[in-house]
Swiss-Prot record:
GO BP terms, alphabetized: translation
Species of provenance: Chromobacterium violaceum (strain ATCC 12472 / DSM 30191 / JCM 1249 / CCUG 213 / NBRC 12614 / NCIMB 9131 / NCTC 9757 / MK)
Protein name: Large ribosomal subunit protein uL16
Disulfide bridge positions per record: none
Physiological role: Binds 23S rRNA and is also seen to make contacts with the A and possibly P site tRNAs.
Lineage: Bacteria, Pseudomonadati, Pseudomonadota, Betaproteobacteria, Neisseriales
Amino acid sequence: MLQPTRLKYRKQHKGRNTGIATRGNKVSFGDFGLKAIGRGRLTARQIEAARRAMTRHIKRGGRIWIRIFPDKPITSKPAEVRMGGGKGSPEYYVAEIQPGKMLYEMDGVSEELAREAFRLAAAKLPIATVFVTKQVGQ
């Protein structure tokens, strides 16, 4: 699973996920992409589950790029622990997703195969997505 090798700070503030993606919002590497139209968080497990679904469907053909990385630590306290005593320890990592962000890209397969692979991947994700193709002259 994806996670940072080392962080400057182990814990982060919660923050607010606002605005739209101004970077990483075009098909840059492959011919087809899965773009987020919703807002939310994707955990490292969800990113990996979607990647596996796509990889299984396209079998040996094509190439997949993961355009997001879970770099935000989410902390939680153990069960049945009273409030106070500081912030909990990091449990897992998430990627904050804004609308318009390109999540995955694919190349070397037909459009029908890519569309079906992305449909299977989208079923594993908690946010709304749309299939996009590379624009000519982009």
